[in-house]
Amino acid sequence: MSLELSSNESEDNFRDELVDISGQVSKKPINIDSRQVRLILDHTAFVRGIGNIKRWFNEEYINSNTTRSNEIINLNIYIPTYTLHEFDFVKKGTSISATNAREAIRFIDNYLENEVEMNSDKIQYNLILESPQDNVPSWNKCNHYKVHSPKIKEFPNYKTKFDSSLIGQTPNVNEDSEFNENFDNALTFNQRNKLNDIQYENSASYQNAIANSDNLAEMPVRLRYLIRSCIYKRFIETKKPKIKNEIEDWKLVTEDPITKIWAKSYGIDCLNVNEAELLIFQNYDVNSFRLYNPYANDGDDFDPSTNILQNTIDTTLYSYSSVQDEPVTSNYRGKNNRGRNNRGRRGNKRRERERWPLSTDAVVSEERNESGTGFIKKEKFGAINYAPRGQGELWRPG
């Protein structure tokens, strides 16, 4: 009997089958999500958070903090001209801020001049500087985007000026020119810099700020350049690709509270460096009204009324028990009797104070706050009231 080999077992046929199989495998779709993160950085973000920003470009740190393997983060960083001009001012000197400013300038130069791409498998970078081609609006047009006019009392410690804006100012203690001249000569440059700064509560500048706390604050002039750039990126520029939700819109990263308040008054979301890091790696925006939960799904809807951390209880609304309402216990001895260990009246008085709750009279009082715009409710420490507890048997471990 002869052995007949089928033509299907030829070498050519095996090669064709392998080609077909490889073609089928390559046709399987691979779902890779892409997420846009758009950040505008001012000089304080670099000066106070240069270490955080540099590790955004560190491969090891990225791999240890990203939670999704099938996601690519497109990190867009925009550096306005305002930031570069502030670098020129801050970098002078030997302070830590000056050192960090020079380090930030070197970091930006190395990125822009580096021929090797710094993109990783999980993050694609796009660092750009503000250019003359950007159609930045004039300041008069920017006023159309203003949503709030902040007052002096909205700023921390009523401080509305940058420290550098106070250089060269001297107090008007005396109109005598000879006094002012001698006074200026007796002070160093740094001392003159801090004369009109709000240092402590009893200072004249602090008391003056409280007296005028209801007046509208005045924006530092040079801050307008930053606000203009932010308005252009957030409201005017055509975004490519288009934003999917509010989280992907441009946000200002700053560590300065004055800048933050003014930026928010023009509808610009603000983050600090740590909050920006949450947005990059965890896709969490602190400007949204939800609590950060790394184990929750992005599709979960947050309801503040169902979360205990969002609820507040005013314990002063509950009734206080008076002395007459407190029943006398069987082991109570009169204050003239001696108790165990031969304790006299002093010990009984101490136990009596601990036993009886304070009277409801003058337990809660309301006073005006320092700014005079509202009231604060005070409760005596010894009469702190608690919300009523539910009924039932307390569980105890076996």
From Swiss-Prot:
This is Nonsense-mediated decay protein 4. Residues 327-355 are annotated as: Disordered. Residues 335-350 have a biased composition (Basic residues). GO terms for cellular component: cytoplasm. It comes from Candida albicans (strain SC5314 / ATCC MYA-2876) (Yeast). Keywords: Cytoplasm, Nonsense-mediated mRNA decay. GO terms for biological process: nuclear-transcribed mRNA catabolic process, nonsense-mediated decay. It comes from the Eukaryota. Involved in nonsense-mediated decay of mRNAs containing premature stop codons. It is found in: Cytoplasm. The lineage of its organism: Eukaryota, Fungi, Dikarya, Ascomycota, Saccharomycotina.
